[in-house]
Amino acid sequence: MANIKSQVKRIRTNEAARLRNQSVKSSLRTAIRSFREAAAAGDKDKANELLVATSRKLDKAASKGVIHANQAANKKSALAQAVNKI
């Protein structure tokens, strides 16, 4: 355990941020998985709906610093390509 007051606070804030980031990443994975399932089923309307929702989640995660902006862009591009293949 840290002895310095600021270190104790950093430990608390880092843990809170870790849990928050973990939650955001989990919801991202779930959104991407549900999109891929719709795309694999060939349901273009549902895939387009989920593409918008997933892109929004990716952008929010990137703006909050949970994932890198380039990673969000690459994932959005791959999802858009998957929709266009249907």
From Swiss-Prot:
A molecular function annotated in GO for this UniProt entry is:
small ribosomal subunit rRNA binding
GO cellular-component term (any): small ribosomal subunit
Q: Which GO terms describe its biological process?
A: translation
Asked if Ribosomal protein is a keyword of the record, the answer is: yes
Keywords on record? Ribonucleoprotein, Ribosomal protein, RNA-binding, rRNA-binding
Similarity annotation: Belongs to the bacterial ribosomal protein bS20 family.
Which purpose does this protein serve, as stated in its record? Answer: Binds directly to 16S ribosomal RNA.
Name the record gives this protein? Small ribosomal subunit protein bS20
Q: What is the lineage of its organism?
A: Bacteria, Bacillati, Actinomycetota, Actinomycetes, Mycobacteriales
